[in-house]
């Protein structure tokens, strides 16, 4: 009887999966058993994207690229004296009227008569101040060479495009209060400074006023208008974007065929190549989760 008890082995303590508590008797420090990976989850938070949806979302980027390209085309034609002051002022009035019309049609619940009147008063003050400051803008960079002006202008436009909010997350609804983030502020300021540099190379005060008014209308007002169109009807947003692409490509082709090929390649890269590349990269995305992950807060600490 005693010999049988002596022959039986006494089982050791069972291994426990604990993060703290020191070494467990009978097991190495790096020991794991079969139950260690039972709670592992693979690709739990990976979002599987559809190619067509990604291509539709990328249209917003091409749309704004076309808007900036059209602004540059207006600058070029103005510097070459192809557009006079009266044509520019007529273009400014047309853009302002069409922008307000789109806002009235897409945001009729947000826009009231008092808010519209307040906008008109602010625009009148803004336009008056811009006209008064036009002579200062005209002579602001007289002592700087034109090559330096064009180099800085191109750099500022690239910075504007790089930091621009293409998702529309920083755009506020009409009448709403929303603090913009740092990158969107830098993007807008870069576009304004680029407009001032271009306007400083124009021959007359009225030219400067018309170009500055056009540029500021587009850079400050166009993102809100395009965002309202997209929120109102996505199909209308696609139709407007493709029409804008066609107009831009036609205008660039009439100006220079090499620039047309470059811009067409850029549009295809943004709308076709990059979405396809993103979908292909999803195949190699691998994420594992388990009890070893750091704890995450499930509430907003700002509340």
Swiss-Prot record:
* Gene Ontology cellular component list: glycosylphosphatidylinositol-N-acetylglucosaminyltransferase (GPI-GnT) complex; membrane
| Residue ranges crossing the lipid bilayer per the database entry | 59-79, 87-107, 120-140, 143-163, 179-199, 209-229, 234-254, 259-279
Q: Which EC numbers does the record give?
A: 2.4.1.198
Q: State whether keyword Glycosyltransferase applies.
A: yes
Q: How does it sit in the membrane?
A: Multi-pass membrane protein
Q: Where in the cell is it found?
A: Endoplasmic reticulum membrane
Q: What is this protein called?
A: Phosphatidylinositol N-acetylglucosaminyltransferase subunit C
Origin organism is Arabidopsis thaliana
